[in-house]
A protein has these predicted regions:
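Helix-to-beta-strand junctions that scaffold the AdoMet/dcAdoMet cofactor pocket
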Residues: 259-261
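Short glycine-centered segments of the SAM/dcSAM-binding site in methyltransferase folds
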Residues: 84, 177, 263-264, 288
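Rossmann-fold dehydrogenase core element
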Residues: 264-266, 277-317
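Glycine-rich beta-strand-centered segment in the early N-terminal region that forms part
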Residues: 22-38, 51-101, 106, 127, ...
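Adenosine-nucleotide cofactor-binding segment
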Residues: 174-183, 195-253
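NAD(P)H dinucleotide-binding glycine-rich loop of Rossmann-like/cofactor-binding domains
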Residues: 78, 94-181
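Glycine-rich Rossmann-fold phosphate-binding loop(s) that bind the pyrophosphate
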Residues: 159, 182-186, 270
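C-terminal hydrophobic helical "lid"/dimerization subdomain
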Residues: 1-4, 253-254, 297-347
């Protein structure tokens, strides 16, 4: 069994540190690949710090992963040695239930989807992308187009599919007015994607410090909620609003009122506390309040191809392994523009 270098934490309060982990040889239908880059997602932080419940330690995070195939198992047809590969949140599902066969493997109910870290089908803990290699089922990996840099590909596997899926599902495109709430790791990609789809894009943020960036990414309007009357002025303005923030004091009612009749509000920010929205604001206008969770494997491949075709990519800061804990703290403090990506060659 190969051994590789990785970075792990030992409990909810520990620093990330180097360690050696075992990686299984690829079995039938599996590929082994060398991880080149791994993105840092806020859900890595929640998980590592046991904020979403207890987890097994040591914990190796990372579900935004890009690399190069080094070995293939028996019967593999999707990949060959040397192929560029991306892996996101999923490492397995039954592939037979109604959700899997419809291309929504993340909602597998037979018995459930298996996430990139936590535990595999055998019940044993699995390690994420903060490592130098990984073995994965070929049908839970995607091809990274040649025109997409691997360091850019890593965040595409979670942050970008999280935005791409609801934009596609709810019809962002020519003639549609789309608002992105928040200009962080998710939001800055939502602006680029919606603009590339042909929508008229606005950004709603607390202040104006990121307005120039938003316009460079393709936004045609910018609204700062810290300014008096900003949300109220947007009544009946948008066909689609995607909210990427988790602030408890966000004016959700004002955002619902900012929708046109038949408009859709999608939350991907996962606020910790319940959202309080008077249903009258939803019913009056036939509006929809929805959520969205990543995307299936086929849709993720579609997203990668779309980003390659339209030159959509994240703005990133590349860090080394010793900087992971510091990067976590910066993400929590919203001090990153716009996504940290770990270079595993520094391990």
């Amino acid at each position: 069994m190969p051994q590789v270098r990785a970075y792990a934490c030992d409990d909810a309060r520990s620093q990330y540190h180097p360690m050696i982990i075992d990686i299984r040889e690829p079995g039938p239908g599996e590929v082994l690949f060398d991880i080149k880059y791994a993105g840092i997602c806020h859900s890595d932080i929640h998980t590592a710090r046991s904020e979403w419940g207890p987890i097994p330690y040591p914990f190796v995070g990372g579900h935004e992963i890009a690399g190069v195939v080094s070995k293939v198992g028996e019967g593999v047809t999707k990949f060959k040695v040397g192929d560029r590969i991306g892996v996101g949140c999923l490492q397995g599902s039954c592939k037979e239930c109604e959700y899997c066969t419809d291309g929504h493997e993340q909602f597998c109910d037979n018995p459930h989807a298996y996430w990139t870290f936590r535990a595999g089908p055998d019940g044993k803990p699995t390690f994420g992308g903060y490592a130098q290699a990984m073995t994965v089922r070929e049908d839970f990996a995607c091809h990274v187009p040649d025109t997409v840099a691997l360091e850019h590909a890593a965040p595409l596997m979670c942050a970008v599919i999280t935005m791409y899926s609801p934009l596609r599902r709810w019809g962002a495109g020519p003639g549609k007015k789309v608002a992105i709430v928040g200009m962080g790791g998710l939001g800055h990609m939502g602006v680029q994607l919606a603009a590339a789809m042909g929508a008229e894009v606005s950004v709603i943020s607390h202040g104006r410090s990121k307005e120039a960036d938003a316009r460079q990414f393709g936004a045609t309007a910018f609204y700062a909620t810290a300014e008096e009357g900003a949300i109220e002025s947007l009544a009946s303005s948008f066909d689609l609003i995607i909210c990427t923030v988790s602030a408890d004091d966000l004016d959700y009612l004002g955002l619902i009122r900012a929708l046109k009749p038949f408009g859709v509000f999608v939350d991907v920010g996962l606020p910790e506390n319940p959202m309080v929205i008077p249903m009258r604001a939803v019913v009056n206008g036939n509006k929809v309040v929805a959520g969205s969770q990543i995307g299936g494997i086929a849709e993720t491949q579609e997203m990668l191809d779309f980003c390659a075709e339209h030159d959509v990519h994240p703005v990133i800061e590349i860090i080394d392994g010793d900087s992971i804990t510091e990067a976590y703290d910066k993400v929590v403090a919203s001090k990153v523009r716009y996504r940290f990506v770990i270079d595993t060659s520094t391990f």
